[in-house]
Amino acid sequence: MSNLKISNMIVICLLTLCLVIIQNRNNTAFSQSNFETKFDPIHIEANEGIEWLSDEKVYIARGEATAKQNNFQLKSDVIKAHYRETQTSDTEIYRLEAIREVIVLSSNRIAYGDYGVYDLDNSVTRLTGKNLRLKTALETIKARKSLEYWDKKRLAIAKGNATAQRGEKQVKADTLSVYFSKTKDDSLTANRIEAVGNVKISTPNEVAVGDEAVYYIEKELVTLLGHVKITRGKSQLNGSIAEVNLKTGRSRLLSKSGLDGNQKVRGLFTRDVKQPEKK
């Protein structure tokens, strides 16, 4: 075989190899890797491998996929890592999309959902699906529509028949905004809850309802606005604005003209009457 034929065959083989590489560039698979973000790198791994779709600018991790960044961890059946090009022609992950059996973990909380999106730029996680819940050492927050956690603000937003439970006290509303603070051991504890729409606050001794409420948890003080009704045993108070001390059991009702068209405060008080003993 002449040198010319050998050279031609080598060229053909190289061209064929280049075509194969180009064709498979959009379907590259590997099991784990580190990816750059706007801030700290993120590590992604999966049992069934990670697929790279360069045209769509996304990595797809399948099979018990996990994404880790510092103390943040995202687990799901499938994780899609969306990336973008930077001004220096590098790439960075900016959005994680989790599909099925989503679990969000950190050192001080855990959350569950069916579908989740993590915005790395703003450190915000949004979960949707059934049985949405977020748990800290002391609180459990549930929702039917969506559940968000803003890491920088230490804020959880629960929408759709939302509840926040701490011990025997429960706050329920259409939307709950739960503000947290960090303790000395780096755990989270709720310090304020803002409730909007069909608000109901329950304790073993009383039930308070209204249109809106702000609950200062450490002080155990609640301010209710709009169509307020407080029930303690068989006694009931109605008004436009109420200040309730859950620790002492004292309630103060006010009337505000124009809030709900009712300028009066009403109360119904009952007491148990002992029946005379039969002789």
What kind of region is each of these model predictions?
Residues 2-279:
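Mature-chain termini and adjacent capping regions
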